[in-house]
């Protein structure tokens, strides 16, 4: 296996989540139900309306008059939704980088369409977390994180994986909130890099200011 990169080794990842009830996990996972290789999240499909939708109900309950949520409102929305299940609610910092991941117009806020995309990703990441947490500890360790990242289609070197574990673990264990923060940052930075990797060969050139804009926001 070649390191590093995100080239042809990603597989065909697809998952259908829109329309699920709040807090409901993604259907059975495994080798046949995987995630999009580049982004590490399901391909989003806007196939359902807001009418009678519990996702929209929770979003609209905290959204401002502009129809968007900031990080604090997103945190409240996700906590009220119960999407974390038995895990601790998402921290404010994790909610900040969730918004940054999908903040394509740089407003520092998230509209409903972006929220639906986030909702799909969170359900998939949660199911992935539960799948690799084989001992049911509520945390993932180094070898379990390696499996989770592999299921998401990323090809990372052992050195990079070790760096990620050191950054997001507490005593060698990664809790769900930190795991999601890792997934968000991995997706966002990969998307940022991939847009500049014009030949899709795992290398890119960009200026310093562009680098700072892309990385400091996450």
Curated annotation (Swiss-Prot):
Gene3D superfamilies: 6.10.140.900, EF-hand. It is a peripheral membrane protein. Transmembrane segments: none annotated. Keywords: Calcium, Cytoplasm, Membrane, Metal-binding, Repeat. Ca(2+) 2 binds at residues 133, 135, 137, 139, 144. GO terms for cellular component: cytoplasm; membrane. It is found in: Cytoplasm; Cytoplasmic granule membrane. This protein has been shown to bind calcium with high affinity. Homodimer. Interacts with SRI and LCP1. This is Grancalcin. It comes from Pongo abelii.
């Amino acid at each position: 296996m070649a390191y590093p990169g995100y080239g042809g080794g990603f597989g065909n990842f697809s998952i259908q989540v829109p329309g699920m009830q709040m807090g409901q996990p993604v259907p059975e996972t495994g080798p046949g139900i995987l995630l999009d290789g580049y982004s590490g999240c399901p391909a989003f499909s806007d196939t359902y309306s807001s009418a009678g939708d519990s996702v929209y109900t929770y979003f609209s309950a905290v959204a401002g008059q502009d129809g968007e949520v900031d990080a604090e409102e997103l945190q409240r929305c996700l906590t009220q939704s119960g999407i974390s299940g038995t895990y601790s609610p998402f921290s404010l910092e994790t909610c900040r980088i969730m918004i940054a991941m999908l903040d394509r117009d740089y407003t520092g806020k998230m509209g409903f369409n972006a929220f639906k995309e986030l909702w799909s990703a969170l359900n998939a990441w949660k199911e992935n977390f539960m799948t690799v947490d084989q001992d049911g500890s509520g945390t993932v360790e180094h070898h379990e994180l390696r499996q989770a990242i592999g299921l998401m289609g990323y090809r990372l070197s052992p050195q990079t994986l070790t760096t990620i574990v050191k950054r997001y673990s507490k005593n060698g264990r990664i809790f769900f909130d930190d795991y999601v923060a890792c997934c968000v940052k991995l997706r966002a930075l990969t998307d940022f890099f991939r847009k500049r990797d014009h030949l899709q060969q795992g290398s890119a050139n960009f200026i310093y200011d562009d680098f700072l804009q892309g990385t400091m926001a996450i």
